[in-house]
């Protein structure tokens, strides 16, 4: 089962709905859930978006403790938390709209971007963003608005996206989530 960590984002229910449409077992759980409870039940973990890093509950601990055990996908805030956990830099994106249609260039088609074209249109939030990826991570997508639209670990199944694949406005969003479900052994 894929467990979706709820960081109080407005779209968390759409992540589960996408998995439901695929027939993939998924459950939304509070970000206060103990990492050990997540470990016992998860074939994979999605760290959802949300309004602030200060309200991320145990999301950082879940990333730290489950790294190398199950695939983890960070979306928006989850992407930023993953970067922070591994030593990357996250900062405010001055002068950027909070949500915007963004053309994203896929630089690396491994993992969650397998089978996707080189460019997609995505719905993204850029209030905060990853400014520097951690060591052992590579940038897998970029845009004119954000140099780190997505990243992945060089060896472990850790993926982060600044944009929202769960939204219908994001081209190939369901394909990204389907690729993640495959990495989790759910498809």
Swiss-Prot record:
Enzyme Commission code: 6.3.5.2
Annotated metabolic or biological route of this protein: Purine metabolism; GMP biosynthesis; GMP from XMP (L-Gln route): step 1/1
User: Where do the catalytic residues lie?
Assistant: 76 (nucleophile), 164, 166
Q: List the disulfide bonds.
A: none
**CDD domains documented for this protein:** GATase1_GMP_Synthase
Domain of life, source organism: Archaea
Note the Pfam families from the entry: GATase
A GO cellular component annotation in the UniProt record: cytosol
Q: Which UniProt keywords apply?
A: ATP-binding, Glutamine amidotransferase, GMP biosynthesis, Ligase, Nucleotide-binding, Purine biosynthesis
| Family matches, as InterPro entries | Class_I_gatase-like, GATASE, GMP_synth_GATase, GMP_synthase_A
Extract the GO molecular function terms from the UniProt entry: ATP binding; GMP synthase activity
Q: Known catalysed reaction(s)?
A: XMP + L-glutamine + ATP + H2O = GMP + L-glutamate + AMP + diphosphate + 2 H(+)
Q: Please report the stretch or stretches of sequence annotated as the Glutamine amidotransferase type-1 domain.
A: 1-187
What NCBIfam families does its record include?
guaA_Nterm, PRK00758.1
Biological role? Catalyzes the synthesis of GMP from XMP.
SUBUNIT field = Heterodimer composed of a glutamine amidotransferase subunit (A) and a GMP-binding subunit (B).
HAMAP family in alphabetical order: GMP_synthase_A
Name listed for the protein in its UniProt record = GMP synthase [glutamine-hydrolyzing] subunit A
Protein species of origin: Methanopyrus kandleri (strain AV19 / DSM 6324 / JCM 9639 / NBRC 100938)
**Gene from which the chain derives:** guaAA
């Amino acid at each position: 089962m894929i467990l979706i960590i709820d960081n109080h984002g407005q779209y968390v229910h759409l992540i589960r709905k996408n998995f439901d449409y695929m027939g993939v077992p998924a459950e939304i759980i509070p970000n206060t859930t103990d990492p050990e409870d997540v470990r016992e039940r998860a074939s994979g973990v999605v760290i959802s978006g949300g309004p602030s890093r200060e309200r991320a509950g145990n999301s950082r601990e879940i990333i730290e403790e489950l790294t190398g055990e199950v695939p983890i996908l960070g979306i928006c805030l989850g992407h930023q938390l993953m970067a922070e956990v591994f030593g990357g830099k996250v900062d405010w994106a001055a002068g950027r709209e909070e949500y915007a249609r963004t053309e994203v260039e896929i630089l690396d088609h491994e993992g969650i971007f397998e089978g996707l074209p080189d460019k997609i249109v995505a719905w993204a939030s850029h209030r905060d963003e990853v400014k520097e990826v951690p060591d052992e991570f590579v940038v897998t997508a970029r845009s004119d608005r954000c140099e780190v639209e997505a990243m992945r670990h060089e060896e472990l199944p850790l993926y982060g996206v600044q944009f929202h694949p769960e939204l219908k406005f994001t081209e190939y969003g369901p394909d990204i989530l389907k690729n993640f479900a495959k990495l989790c052994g759910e498809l």
